[in-house]
């Protein structure tokens, strides 16, 4: 048999016996404290990294040139034509 029944588990329900619960009781608070510290450190690193990487100021100093209305219309036409070409190709 691959799994031998443990004397600390009920063989019918596989729940912990009262002896196992008593044996684990002294470590419960320390384990919760350790879990809290681990989750806090991991969460802190995640939040710090997320905030650091999402500073999107790479092009903040690059001025955006004004665009001529005629040029804007031409760009819109090109974009619409590109959308139609992609839609026709995907059909």
Curated annotation (Swiss-Prot):
Residues exposed to the Mitochondrial intermembrane side: 54-91
Membrane topology, from the record: Single-pass membrane protein
Subcellular localization, as worded in the UniProt entry: Mitochondrion inner membrane
Transmembrane feature ranges: 31-53
Positions on the Mitochondrial matrix side per record topology: 1-30
Keyword tags: Membrane, Mitochondrion, Mitochondrion inner membrane, Transmembrane, Transmembrane helix
GO biological process: mitochondrial cytochrome c oxidase assembly
Quaternary state and interactors: Component of 250-400 kDa complexes called cytochrome oxidase assembly intermediates or COA complexes.
Stated role: Required for assembly of cytochrome c oxidase (complex IV).
Protein name: Cytochrome c oxidase assembly factor 3, mitochondrial
Lineage: Eukaryota, Fungi, Dikarya, Ascomycota, Saccharomycotina
């Amino acid at each position: 048999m691959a799994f031998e029944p443990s004397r600390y588990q009920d063989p019918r329900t596989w729940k912990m016996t009262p002896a196992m619960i008593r044996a684990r009781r002294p470590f419960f608070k320390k384990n919760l404290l350790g879990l809290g510290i681990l989750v806090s450190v991991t969460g802190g690193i995640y939040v710090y990294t997320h905030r650091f990487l999402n500073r999107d100021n790479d092009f903040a100093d690059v001025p955006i040139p004004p665009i001529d209305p005629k040029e804007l219309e031409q760009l819109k036409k090109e974009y619409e034509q590109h959308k139609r070409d992609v839609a026709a190709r995907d059909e």
